[in-house]
Each structure stands twice: as structure tokens, then as C-alpha cells.
Design a protein with these regions (language model features):
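Short aromatic-cysteine micro-motif
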Residues: 1-75, 95-114, 186-187
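Short, well-ordered turn and helix-capping elements at secondary-structure junctions
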Residues: 92, 105-107, 165-168
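Short linear interaction motif-like sites in intrinsically disordered regions of transcription factors
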Residues: 6, 37, 48, 68, ...
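Short, surface-exposed glycine/acidic/tryptophan-bearing loops
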Residues: 85
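Surface-exposed recognition segments
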Residues: 75-76, 97-99, 116-187
Length: 187
């Protein structure tokens, strides 16, 4: 399956509604994905203007800062859970570019999270921009590309699977090496 950033926010709101949680994402003032229309396959200014209610109790994509904190797992390894890539990540060297692998087949990080390095790149909420100490925790207000983190099975160089590595792409692009992970507010 291929997934773009727009697909990810639809999933988050639909899952939130199915579990009687307050959806986080809004497009044109509506949190109901059934009113948003067809998921775009090209750049779409209406969908790009989606907002996120970070106080809602529903599912959402992590911000880039949250993603990195989760990937580090309370440790300071190069990859999520180890300094040895093959211990924790699926990438070109150990997949022969043959596709996504079953989750939880590599070691977890310090928080017990799997596949934060490799397997599929993970969409984050943020628009891509340079990061500084004064950067907002939820990223810049607009841009051309959304943040992707973690590397994938299609990553030719282990560098892209490093926790500190940043990548981005147009939110309408779908590839089978793109995916997402959801987060919720802690109780």
C-alpha cells in the first residue's frame, strides 16, 4: 500500500471518531473527513491549510520534535535503539530493496518502540524548514514539503535511518516506503 500525508490525517480523524475521541485535524472548519472530499493526489491548498488541535484527545501525527524524542527512546544511539543499524532497522542493505517488513522483527528502542529507524519513512505534522533553538515545537506555519523521518527499506544509505536525519516530501506523494505512526495525549 502507498500512503501520503493527506491519507494519514484522514486515518487519524476516522480512527478518532470510531473510538469516540475528539478528532485533531480540521479542514475548512470541519473535523469530519467524510466532508473533506477525495484525498488529493496533487498539491492542494485547502488540504495544506489543515489545522491541528493539539489539545484534542484523538489520534494525530507526531510533530517532528515529538518523533525525534520518541525515536531516541531516552538514549543517545545513532539509530532508534542501537548504534548498530542491522540490529534495529530494515534498509536497502538488509532488504535488497524488496519491500516493507513485518513490524517488531528488529529490536525496540528504550521506550519499547519498534521500527523508528528503517522499514518506512514516517510522516510528521510539520512543514519542512531549518531548525534552530527558537523553532516552534510544532514547526513552521506553511511550506511546500512535510517532514518525513526514520528512513525506510528503500534507503540506500544507513545515514537516512539515523535518528537525527531529516527528510521531507510533498504531502500529496504516495510511495510504499512512506508510512506513519500515530500519537495521542497522555492521560
Amino acid at each position: 500500500n502507498e500512503v501520503n500525508w493527506y491519507d494519514a490525517i484522514v486515518y487519524c480523524n476516522k480512527r478518532s471518531k470510531a473510538e469516540n475521541l475528539t478528532p485533531c485535524y480540521s479542514i475548512d472548519g470541519s473535523t469530519d473527513p467524510d466532508t473533506w472530499g477525495t484525498v488529493p493526489t496533487s498539491s492542494n491548498s485547502t488540504w495544506d491549510a489543515a489545522t491541528c488541535d493539539f489539545e484534542a484527545n484523538g489520534y494525530r501525527l507526531p510533530t517532528e520534535a515529538e518523533w525525534e524524542w520518541l525515536a531516541r527512546g531516552g538514549q543517545n544511539y545513532t539509530y532508534a535503539g542501537s548504534d548498530t543499524i542491522d540490529r534495529v532497522a530494515w534498509y536497502t542493505e538488509n532488504t535488497n530493496t524488496t519491500g516493507t517488513r513485518e513490524v517488531k522483527t528488529k529490536a525496540p528502542n528504550g521506550y519499547g518502540l519498534y521500527d523508528m529507524s528503517g522499514n518506512v519513512y514516517e510522516w510528521c505534522w510539520d512543514w519542512s524548514d531549518s531548525i534552530s533553538d527558537s523553532s516552534a515545537a510544532d514547526g513552521v506555519a506553511s511550506g511546500n514539503n512535510r517532514v518525513l523521518r526514520g528512513g525506510s527499506w528503500f534507503t540506500f544509505d544507513g545515514l537516512y535511518c539515523q535518528v537525527a536525519n531529516r527528510n521531507s516530501d510533498n504531502p500529496n506523494l504516495r510511495f510504499n516506503w512512506y508510512g506513519f505512526r500515530v500519537v495521542r495525549l497522555a492521560n
